[in-house]
Amino acid sequence: VQYPPLDNSAILAYSFCMLEHNFFTPPPRILAHRGDSEFYPENTLPAFISAERLKVDVIETDVHLTADNDVVIWHDKTLDHQTNGSGIVEAFTLKQLKMLDAGYYYTKDDGKTFPFRGTGITLMSLDEALETLPDMRFNIDLKTKDSRLPVKFTEIVGKHNAMDRILGASFHTENLQALRSLMPGMSTSFSTYEVFTLFIKQKLGFRPSSREKFKGQVLQVPERYGFLKVLTDRFMRSFHDAGIYIHVWTINDEADMRRLIRMGADAIFTDNPRLLQKVYAAIPIPKNYFKYRAE
């Protein structure tokens, strides 16, 4: 695979982005989706510790606001799918949530066995995650659409002096606007609305400039939105030239991983970080990969 150099303006744009936002130093490649979720219950401490031991670059996770204004790590809106509890996450206090079995429904054999049921795995708070893994970078999706969540979230991040190792994400533009206002030095992705706006502009011929002040530092997108193909060579080149990173979610197929890396994806979300590590190890990528892109 040939990796031709970007022009000088694009390289300067990447350099500026990296200097201003330390989360991208060094730029991540492997984002473990909800931790090592292939082998452990997702978004739990064992999944996070395993991901750290695998030396992944970033753990991707999700947070909700609890009924007592704390921040709990969990993906789903409800508790029914993964725990022995039931109901909306945000209706419970952190203490109540931590009484639930977060490994209750984890299975690798279509429900024949539940190896983590009753082993003491509970939901955890954002505070616990940052305390337990002080050197890990986190990509955190703020799920609750509530103005109190960004406030409490940045308070906890500040308490742990963790701003440089957090990338804030959310489907809700209001959450990201609040994060950028409350903690301007924190890296953020683009919301769904922001991505869609940039996508449409790019399709209409808009070419983003490295001189523009973008709200976020990274586009985190699927390869397709329904019938729309997002990741084209033109799309990737346009935003790379403007200094914007591109992360792709969620890829678990080896052939897809190889293809996206060769296209120039900066990082990939995966449930199977072991496989992605193997793929990266087999593809000859130069050390200065993030200053080069595939044609």
For each feature predicted by the language model, list its residue ranges.
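Short, positively charged and aromatic/hydrophobic N-terminal segments
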Residues: Q2, D7, I11-Y14
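Glycine-rich beta-to-alpha transition loops that act as phosphate-gripper elements at the mouths
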Residues: R34-G35, E42, S170, E194, ...
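C-terminal active-site rim and adjoining tail of enzyme catalytic domains
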Residues: F199-E295
